[in-house]
Design a protein with these regions (language model features):
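Short hydrophobic/Thr-rich beta-strand motif most characteristic of the beta2 strand and flanking loop
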Residues: 28-36, 44
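Active-site beta3 strand of CheY-like receiver
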Residues: 48-54
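Short amphipathic alpha-helix used as the core "switch/output" element in two-component signaling
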Residues: 65-77
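Acidic catalytic/metal-coordinating carboxylates
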Residues: 37-40, 62-66
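Active-site residues of response regulator receiver
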Residues: 10, 56, 84
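Receiver (REC) domain active-site loop signature in two-component systems and cognate sites
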Residues: 59
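Short, flexible helix-to-coil linker/hinge segments that flank and couple to helix-turn-helix
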Residues: 90-97, 101-148
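A short, hydrophobic beta-strand element within the central beta-sheet of small alpha/beta folds
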Residues: 77-87
């Protein structure tokens, strides 16, 4: 099997370098491009083939949602996974509405990252376990409040 081709889009070079290092340890993954901004990613989009894009949410200039919308308008086949420090509902809702197929918190372990790549590359969706746990907890709280 060919390795998954991955692009990293994040304005923090230290984070990109660390994630690239972790992904390169995985025989099933190959980083084929990096961008420090949404604008840089959109400029490179036509010249790089990728299976999965890891997209930061909070970047200067175009944020992750704006970049995702524009990228998918050019390449509807792209599979984008959001990487963010922010797990609030407004962030992942915005990214899902923009067309992202997954959402990982930046404190996820490498096993979750690899599982997200495999799941999203195969056409599925992936949301970090911490995020799903938080979401279901909030939903239960709302249901309990509505029952009172």
């Amino acid at each position: 099997m060919e390795p998954y081709k991955i692009i990293l889009v994040d304005d923090h070079s230290l984070f990109r370098n660390g994630l690239r290092g972790l992904l390169e340890r995985c025989a099933a993954c190959r980083v084929v491009g990096e961008a420090a901004s949404g604008e840089e990613f959109l400029a490179m989009l036509g010249g790089v083939d990728a299976d999965v894009v890891f997209m930061d949410f909070a970047m200067p200039g175009l944020d992750g949602a704006q970049t995702t919308e524009r990228a998918l308008a050019q390449r509807p086949d792209l599979k984008i996974i959001t990487l963010s420090m922010f797990g609030e509902e407004s962030y992942y809702s915005r990214m899902v509405e923009a067309g992202a197929r997954g959402f990982l918190l930046k404190d996820s372990d490498i096993g979750d990252v690899i599982e997200a790549v495999e799941t999203v590359a195969a056409g599925g969706s992936y949301f970090s376990p911490q995020l799903l746990s938080s979401l279901t907890g909030r939903m239960r709280t709302r249901e309990d409040a509505a029952d009172e």
